């Protein structure tokens, strides 16, 4: 039997919970919602599901609130539990997951008061079919909905070829690091990738009592930059929008260097945040593709930074020889019971290196081709691709489809090719608020039309 809801949200991570909470908070009429996720309701995506206290947020506590009208919401919640917490602290991600659970519980209580029904359904979304209503096809059955929200979060590159080999680790957040402390047969570990996920592994290895050799393998061989130890907001000056929006990438790089000259580069980068998406949208299609392929990693290093204490631990390991940074591209892996052979491209030559253990920390794959649902919907013509391989198109209300049967909204990762900066909490909470407002306007408008028709 097909179930019918007003709204179906695909994704139960931060984006999905943010859309749900915003809808319930703002709704003035009864609604029915279903949240579809492959995980249990208390799991908010891989990074936020980590149980490890050393895995920290990379945004200050005061900026991690779920609601766009309350940026300090997370800090206020955390400080009420622990008065030693400061607004500028980078807190454990597991604490942030507890905050999301508290938001979810409060949302359920508010929904009950407003006669809004919510169901959490553990299922895999497989297809969407248009008709008199949209039909969401899942592996647990079909769902009719007038509005479907794609809040599907990040697709990790390591999941593309995830293996069950015990020597080749793809889930670095739930690995039993403590077991390594006394493991005499694990003397060399490779970390593939050098972004924030790689830092999670490095820090856990440094803190678990293991004393072997780490080798970080990546094309850039650079770890994320650190935030200033103390963020001085008085140094954050407004950037001249005209010097950046509508300019070619080379000109923007020139302006950035000029802004940072004789000053702290952190604040020059951060000054672009209010209009980074406008810079991206003003690029020509060839420039967007060029920036995504050639400069994205460089941008990420400087824009998506880590807590200074985390970077200091990694730098100490590099200086002491415990951590080796190697510029190389990993082409394939062969794991056996005793270790992993890693095939590399290094300085134009093929090379094979043997490690006792490998952590794959190669981050997010923004390519449309990596997401089966998005790929299927584009092939059917239900969604339009961006003008590059990295996402889908959407309008100002984040509608990706508006036609027969209803509306499909999208936020977060699927919009990377359209918006560029679209995965950090400050971006996601703004998108969630906009999506929720549009969903409510559509649903409550439909209810008013139905009531008016009944009265004629």
PLM regions: where:
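Flavin (primarily FAD) cofactor-binding/catalytic cores of flavoenzymes
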Residues: 2-40, 46, 83-242, 253-447, ...
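Extended, charge-rich low-complexity interaction segments
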Residues: 68-77, 250-258, 419
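Active-site-adjacent bridging/hinge elements
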Residues: 74-78, 407-410
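N-terminal glycine-rich dinucleotide-binding loop that anchors FAD/FMN and/or NAD(P) in oxidoreductases
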Residues: 49-73, 232-248, 309-312
């Amino acid at each position: 039997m097909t179930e019918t809801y007003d709204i179906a949200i695909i994704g139960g991570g931060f984006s999905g919970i943010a859309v749900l909470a915003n809808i319930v908070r703002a709704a003035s009429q009864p609604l029915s919602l279903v949240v579809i996720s492959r995980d249990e309701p208390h799991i908010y995506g891989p990074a936020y599901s980590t149980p490890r206290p050393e895995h920290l947020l990379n945004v200050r506590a005061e900026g991690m609130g779920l609601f766009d009208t309350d940026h300090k919401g997370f800090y206020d919640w955390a400080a009420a539990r622990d008065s030693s917490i400061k607004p500028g602290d980078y807190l454990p991600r597991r604490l942030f997951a507890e905050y999301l659970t508290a938001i979810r519980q409060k949302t359920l209580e508010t929904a009950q008061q407003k006669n809004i029904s919510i169901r959490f359904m553990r299922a895999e979304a497989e297809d969407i079919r248009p008709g008199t209503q949209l039909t969401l096809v899942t592996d647990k059955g079909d769902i009719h909905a007038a509005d479907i929200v794609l809040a599907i979060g990040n697709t990790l590159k390591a999941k593309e070829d995830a293996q069950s080999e015990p020597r080749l680790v793809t889930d670095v957040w739930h690995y039993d690091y403590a077991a390594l402390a006394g493991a005499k047969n694990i003397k060399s570990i490779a970390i593939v990738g050098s972004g924030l996920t790689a830092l999670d592994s490095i820090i856990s290895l440094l803190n678990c009592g293991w004393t072997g050799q780490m080798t970080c393998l990546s094309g850039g061989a650079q770890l994320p930059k650190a935030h200033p130890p103390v963020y001085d907001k008085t140094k954050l000056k407004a950037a001249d929008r005209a010097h950046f929006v509508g300019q070619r990438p080379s000109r923007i790089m020139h302006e950035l260097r000029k802004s940072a000259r004789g000053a702290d580069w952190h604040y020059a980068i951060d000054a672009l945040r209010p209009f980074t998406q406008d810079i991206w949208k003003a690029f020509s299609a060839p420039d967007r593709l060029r920036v995504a392929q050639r400069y994205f990693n460089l941008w990420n290093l400087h824009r998506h930074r880590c807590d200074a204490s985390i970077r200091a631990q990694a730098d100490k390991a590099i200086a002491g020889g415990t951590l080796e940074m190697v510029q190389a591209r990993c082409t394939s892996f062969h794991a056996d019971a005793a270790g992993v052979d890693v095939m590399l491209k290094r300085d134009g030559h093929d090379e094979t290196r043997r490690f006792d253990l490998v952590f794959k920390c190669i981050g997010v794959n923004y390519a449309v081709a990596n997401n089966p649902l998005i790929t299927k919907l584009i092939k059917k013509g239900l969604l339009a691709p961006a003008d590059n391989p990295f996402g889908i198109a959407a309008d100002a209300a984040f509608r990706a489809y508006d036609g027969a049967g209803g509306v499909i909204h999208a936020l977060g990762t699927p919009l990377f090719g359209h918006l560029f900066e679209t995965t950090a909490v400050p971006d996601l909470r703004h998108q969630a608020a906009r999506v929720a407002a549009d969903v409510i306007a559509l649903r409550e408008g439909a209810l008013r039309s139905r009531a008016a028709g009944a009265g004629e």
